[in-house]
Amino acid sequence: MKRSTVVIRPSARALSRQASSQSFLLARSSALTSRQRRLYSTHPPNARLNLPIDYATTPLLAHTSQAALSNPELPASVRNGTTKRMNLFQAINDALSTALAEDESVLIFGEDVAFGGVFRCTTKLAETYGGDRVFNTPLTEQGIMGFAIGAAAEGMRPVAEIQFADYVFPAFDQLVNEAAKFRYRDGAGGRSAGGLTVRMPCGGVGHGALYHSQSPEALFTHIPGLKVIIPRGPVQAKGLLLAAIRSNDPCVVMEPKILYRAAVEQVPTTAYELPLGKAEILKEGKDVTVVSYGQPLYKCMAALKAAEQDFGVSVELIDLRTIYPWDKETVFNSVRKTGRCVVVHEAMVNAGVGAEVAAAIQEDPETFVRLEAPVARIAGWSIPTPLVFEQFNLPDVTSKCYLTLGLADVYADGMPRDIRRHQKGDEFLRDLSMNSGILKQSMLHSSRRGVDWLMGIVLDDIILSVFLV
Amino acid sequence: MFSRAVRLSRAALPIRVASQRVPIAARRSVTTNAAQAQVDKSTIPESEDEPFTIRLSDESFETYELDPPPYTLEVTKKQLKQMYYDMVVVRQMEMAADRLYKEKKIRGFCHLSVGQEAVAVGVEHAIEKTDDVITSYRCHGFAYMRGGTVRSIIGELLGRREGIAYGKGGSMHMFTKGFYGGNGIVGAQVPVGAGLAFAQKYTGGKKATVILYGDGASNQGQVFEAFNMAKLWNLPALFGCENNKYGMGTSAARSSALTDYYKRGQYIPGLKVNGMDVLAVKAAVQYGKQWTVEGNGPLVLEYVTYRYGGHSMSDPGTTYRTREEIQRMRSTNDPIAGLKQRIINWGVATEEEVKGIDKAARAHVNEEVAAAEAMAPPEPTAKILFEDIYVKGTEPRYIRGRTLDEVYYFN
């Protein structure tokens, strides 16, 4: 391994072509320098599209008090109140504090929560509400969950924290076989574990490797009897978490850990709930529906902005918020309007939320007949989370997807923008044979554009909106 | 049950060396002093390889339904020096990791074992290469002692291809021959260790598995499930709780109903060991291995140790314990200083020679760390991202997070 750079190796043929052009080599050398610095899968240098998310300006967060209070889902009393700037963990802390204050039966426990928790979500709660209501548990996930279920069955409202979603698996049996089935099996007895809320941080964090970056939400969506909730920011986190705590169903609240400090917005100071099982349309559009939840929403927003600007398409963005049971009506209505749908999540693609949404869309006759393209999924690959290559796995702004039948196209970061939908769409559809293999077509096309495909590396410089032909 | 344990441990007392410092009636506990072993200096041979007998402190062990190991240990000068060298290398390696982390060259989660070196080193000096070791996420020292090189361990932390796990695992997930990790899930390695022990028993040979977990992990249900299987099938398993007093930020007493972790096996005999004294660890594990491979079934050991640093790199380690406590352990119970003192006092090596060992260990680590830092960062290719997961040919044909200017293209 003498090679000093991280470049993708060009073929011999490509090299000889390069050698023939001195100016070309010179032009590459400056890029090499930037490559050398990129030891981790951080944001690409010189990227036009895959830029770091600017949480300070994203329209997905309420940056002003006015924006936060204009939310029509909030009751009038809240909208007439005040707001405070909070990040995600502070909003969660606020919700937990509210729940503890308003209801004696609310308990909070988990590993290290009395010290504030590893992500600071429970800061000062033990001091304020006492060690008998906010307390540390041993490192015993299965025990924590069973304990919480027992407490909930007696009418308490336990909020159990699993320190990382990756640690929840020992507790899986308790969630699946006890919490979710409690009401069903008790029947007329009327007991349930409905007061149970489980919180856990999930998702990529940049370098979590095998056991600190997973997104196991789809596993819980397979269990009737649980509600699975993923907030995208502080306002949501507070409202959804309070709703979950007050809800009489066992709820799993998964918090994208990368947003704990990154996502900051104005949050109403008074207590409020946001509806569970209800999606939110973040942006209306007419050509394609993008369905997502949690952190990838920010990337979707960046992608659709680029798509709208570059291709003149109009994209609708839906935040599922509750991923089980999810809001089919909102999604179906949107897809009936646009005819196209992309589902985006970090968790691996197989048997994920995307699969469920896609299947439901095609099962619904009224929505199916309106489809103009297969429902696409952009999700993590079917791999364990890599250590240094996390960004190479997570969906990004330019993730490839095939929205139209058989059409694959390449839109490269920094390449001339000549594949505009309105100019070429119909031509491409005619050119590409439906059954010749999407990838092959895209490769042919890319080769024409001079991308080096010989190493079998296809860059992810393919923007989803290209396919909205 | 516990009264029986107390009775047994009293009954075992006469076996111990004559000098009892603690009244029998008083509740005794294992010392964490690292320099209490003694030797009759006249018995120390000239030769490096000739064994001589040292006498361990009578506070080195506590037992539960088990006769204590002999309070004597045969060692050679060479072994003592090697143990010292190994502990210094492990500590230097951890310090290097600390530095690289603070320089932001190592990212992610990283747990250091500074202060706990005597356990990894003592265990390895008591077992054979054919035995197995499996441990928790605080695994750098074990990976080194099992045969991993410093460069491959630091390379792993840096995410390099030449790292011990191809740069894919990082701090918590290291594997080498006879070493099954490194596991990021608290307690998950314990039943896996029982399976390793079963395979050893099944395939025959006098082999054992050393299974380590922390005081925090000892409350995981699967630890008890593993205990039961190991005893039921009489497996050659040496369960070992590395009790460093804190599971993350929660002290043992706040998380555990019974902090005598060596008694946690209930129906499995237990042995509590001074985990700051590498010689006591060696003596205990040596004894435990012999005991278990003779068909006596599993053993639950407890290594009483201490970590100087925080739980991980993001924990300063001072919010849940006093600085004085850390300072006291460092200054009076340090495993490396303890062994050093004895080596010099016993005349096994002169102060100059010990300094030479220090220097050699430091130079070795520096050289290896430099080599690790010089390793090329992994190529961001699909091959690396998808290898060992997808059947060849079925991989996704592209990776994410790249831009066009990061490839060569022609035309």
UniProtKB/Swiss-Prot annotation, chain A:
Task: List the GO cellular component terms.
Answer: mitochondrial matrix
Catalytic reactions on record: N(6)-[(R)-lipoyl]-L-lysyl-[protein] + 3-methyl-2-oxobutanoate + H(+) = N(6)-[(R)-S(8)-2-methylpropanoyldihydrolipoyl]-L-lysyl-[protein] + CO2
Q: Which cofactor does it need?
A: thiamine diphosphate
Pfam families (UniProt xref): Transket_pyr, Transketolase_C
The entry's localization annotation reads:
Mitochondrion matrix
Which residues are the transit peptide here?
A: 1-40
InterPro entries in the record, alphabetically?
THDP-binding, Transketo_C/PFOR_II, Transketolase-like_Pyr-bd, Transketolase_C
Q: What is its EC number?
A: 1.2.4.4
UniProt GO molecular function: 3-methyl-2-oxobutanoate dehydrogenase (2-methylpropanoyl-transferring) activity; metal ion binding
Q: One biological-process term from Gene Ontology?
A: response to nutrient
Question: What keywords are annotated for this sequence in UniProt?
Answer: Metal-binding, Mitochondrion, Oxidoreductase, Potassium, Transit peptide
Positions binding thiamine diphosphate in this chain are Y167
Q: Where does K(+) bind?
A: G194, L196, T197
**Job description of the protein:** The branched-chain alpha-keto dehydrogenase complex catalyzes the overall conversion of alpha-keto acids to acyl-CoA and CO(2). It contains multiple copies of three enzymatic components: branched-chain alpha-keto acid decarboxylase (E1), lipoamide acyltransferase (E2) and lipoamide dehydrogenase (E3).
State the oligomer form and interacting partners. Answer: Heterotetramer of 2 alpha and 2 beta chains.
Q: What is this protein called?
A: 2-oxoisovalerate dehydrogenase subunit beta, mitochondrial
- Species name: Chaetomium thermophilum (strain DSM 1495 / CBS 144.50 / IMI 039719) (Thermochaetoides thermophila)
Q: What is the lineage of its organism?
A: Eukaryota, Fungi, Dikarya, Ascomycota, Pezizomycotina
From Swiss-Prot, chain B:
Annotated protein name in UniProt: Pyruvate dehydrogenase E1 component subunit alpha, mitochondrial
Transit peptide per record = 1-29
PANTHER family from the xrefs? PYRUVATE DEHYDROGENASE E1 COMPONENT SUBUNIT ALPHA, PYRUVATE DEHYDROGENASE E1 COMPONENT, ALPHA SUBUNIT BACTERIAL AND ORGANELLAR
Residues given in the record as Mg(2+) binding sites: D215, N244, Y246
What does UniProt give as the signal peptide span? none
Instruction: Note the subunit structure.
Output: Eukaryotic pyruvate dehydrogenase (PDH) complexes are organized as a core consisting of the oligomeric dihydrolipoamide acetyl-transferase (E2), around which are arranged multiple copies of pyruvate dehydrogenase (E1), dihydrolipoamide dehydrogenase (E3) and protein X (E3BP) bound by non-covalent bonds. The Chaetomium thermophilum PDH complex contains 60 E2 units, 12 E3BP units, about 20 E1 units, and 12 or more E3 units. The units are organized in 1 E2 60-mer, 4 E3BP trimers, about 20 E1 tetramers, and a maximum of 12 E3 dimers.
* Record-level Gene Ontology MF annotations: metal ion binding; pyruvate dehydrogenase (acetyl-transferring) activity
Just give the chief location class: mitochondrion
The membrane spanning regions, by residue number, are none
Instruction: Name the keywords, alphabetized.
Output: Magnesium, Metal-binding, Mitochondrion, Oxidoreductase, Pyruvate, Thiamine pyrophosphate, Transit peptide
Residues binding thiamine diphosphate: Y137, R138, G184, V186, D215, G216, A217, N244, H311
Residues that coordinate or bind pyruvate? H111, Y137, R138, G184, V186, D215, G216, A217, N244, Y246
The cofactor(s) it depends on are: thiamine diphosphate; Mg(2+)
What is this enzyme's EC?
A: 1.2.4.1
